[in-house]
């Protein structure tokens, strides 16, 4: 078919990673944060053992040992401090320096959803998120940095200046199944925004 499978199945052990390596060109596992503080009482990851930073870091490291390209990233705006964001970026950088398998870092702003316990959580401000994107580029100057444009429909052009070089998957055929309330921008519009910033758009 010409399709290149990319599976994001969360926290997998080495055997599971090895099995997926046979049929996937790359895998995905969002670190989200390296802060174990966020697994504490009344914190976002209290009841999510699969999102424990140690478990996620183990996946990234095991993928590195198996020479599996992997995409990871941070979720910004779930209660982390700026220092914790920097620490998380450094963790990703160190894993990539050791194994060279991190192919992309996604900087994703948290968008509160109805019917969740964090529905009243304030999303990160544009200035804060722009700062975190800039920090990702400073800490990892040669890394592919992505921001999903549909989660910042009014601001996404500014992330080019902050250092991103990838818009991620934008589909003219399907919705964003993870964030169905956030429609994709028109690809022609994204291309125009990219070209106006002085860069070539490659789809």
Model features per residue range: what roles?
Residues 21, 64, 195:
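Anion (oxyanion) recognition and catalysis
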Residues 1-60, 69-72, 78, 99-108, ...:
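Core AdoMet radical
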Residues 29, 63, 92:
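Conserved hydrophobic/aromatic pocket- or pore-lining residues that grip, position, or stack substrates
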Residues 55-65, 129-133:
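Structured alpha-helical segments in the cores of large, soluble enzyme domains
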Residues 83:
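Anionic-ligand-binding alpha/beta catalytic cores of soluble enzymes and soluble regulatory domains
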Residues 76-79, 175-177:
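Short histidine/acidic/glycine/proline-rich micro-motifs that form metal-
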Residues 86-203:
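Auxiliary Fe-S-binding modules of radical SAM enzymes
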């Amino acid at each position: 078919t010409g399709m290149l499978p990319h599976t994001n199945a969360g926290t997998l052990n080495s055997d599971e990673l090895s099995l997926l390596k046979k049929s996937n060109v790359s895998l995905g596992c969002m670190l989200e944060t390296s802060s174990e503080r966020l697994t504490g009482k009344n914190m976002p990851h209290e009841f999510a053992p699969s999102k424990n930073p140690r478990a996620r870091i183990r996946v990234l490291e095991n993928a590195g040992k198996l020479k599996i390209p992997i995409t990871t990233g941070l979720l910004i705006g779930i209660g982390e401090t700026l220092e914790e964001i920097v620490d998380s970026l450094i963790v990703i950088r160190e894993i990539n320096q050791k194994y060279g398998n991190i192919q992309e870092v996604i900087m994703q702003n948290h968008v509160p959803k109805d019917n969740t316990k964090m529905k009243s959580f304030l999303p990160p401000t544009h200035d804060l998120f722009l700062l975190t994107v800039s920090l990702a580029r400073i800490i990892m100057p040669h890394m592919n940095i992505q921001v999903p444009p549909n989660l910042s429909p009014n601001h996404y052009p500014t992330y080019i200046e902050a250092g991103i070089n990838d818009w991620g998957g934008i589909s003219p055929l399907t919705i964003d199944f993870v964030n169905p309330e956030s429609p994709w921008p028109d690809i022609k519009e994204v291309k125009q925004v990219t070209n106006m910033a002085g860069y070539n758009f490659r789809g």
